[in-house]
Amino acid sequence: MGVPVAPSQSLVAQFDTLWTRFDEIYPSFAYKGVDWRAQRATYRPRAQRARSQDELIGVLVEMLTPLRDLHVWLVDPRGQAVPTFRPAGLANFDRTRWESAMRDASYLAHSRDFGEGMVGGYAYLYIGAWKDPVSQESLDLALARMRDAPGLIIDVRSNPGGTDQTALAFAGRFTTRAFTASYVEIRTDSLVKDVEMPLARTISPRGGWQFTRPVVVLSGRGGFSATESFVAAMRTLPQVTVLGDTTGGASGNPATFALGNGWRFTVPRWLEFGPDRRPIEGRGVAPHLAMSWDPTHYDGARDPLIDAAVGLLGERNGVYRIAPAPSREAPVETPTDRGLRR
């Protein structure tokens, strides 16, 4: 049981603070099918009856859960996040298998979330987050070391996000022309009439040269936020194949606000769409080639997606051909005996 808070009006004031911030900023009520005023009518009386901070937090979590938004959470005074939604997604990244694969890859770990190596004669780059120590400079330096590689694997399966600017700037190293990477829709003040929504986000070529050889991006349900912006951008480029699973479907660019009694809460500020203008929120970004993740079907402790990526790069470089996918979802025979589905 939580410590009582006196007077109880302070709990109602916290409720009103959170509800009002969402009412002013959150862009996705209609998209999520949530009547926010109805939520207030249902949950404010319960906030009035709450007798402790913990009781209020329980009420707020219940009110926010129908948004099904991974960027909506509360933060306690110790800095621990309290989620309002947990997706039931299957991961396609097993760190034990990955570490086993990296032992054969001359892998150089710059940090837990960033490293590079060579797999099957192709450059490999693991990006586990878009935040320090991963930066535009560190990514540029890694790419410079891979400049002469016949192909590149970029692994972002387990990347939960970080700084959009870093992710999109890196995508600029793979294009020779400017293009629209995504669109974002934000709430605007009623007095602002000259801003047309959604806003286009454009990527331009960056750096003195661009990597235009074949690239495979490994994606999965563990990729969120800035990673989804990156995958959505990369999958439009002609030399890029996205392999794996659909991304997690959470791209909201949240801001953090004070709630009261040391608590804070987040409010997503935009609804993002891919270059095809389909929402990313709740849907994710699909791969070009979907590959089921059932490691029990594979020999030893290898990482099947990395093996499949090597096979794809071999095909792109004319080393060998991957058999076309059959009409039904049966495993496809490839040079690495890995199943791919178009």
Protein language model regions, located:
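Catalytic cores of large soluble enzymes that bind and process phosphate-bearing ligands
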Residues: S10, R51, E55, G222, ...
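Flexible, low-complexity junctional segments that flank or bridge functional domains
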Residues: M1-I203, P254-A258, R264, L312-R342
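Extracytoplasmic/peripheral linker and loop segments enriched in polar/acidic and small residues
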Residues: H288-A330
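Conserved acidic, small-residue-rich alpha-beta core segments centered on
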Residues: Q165-R302
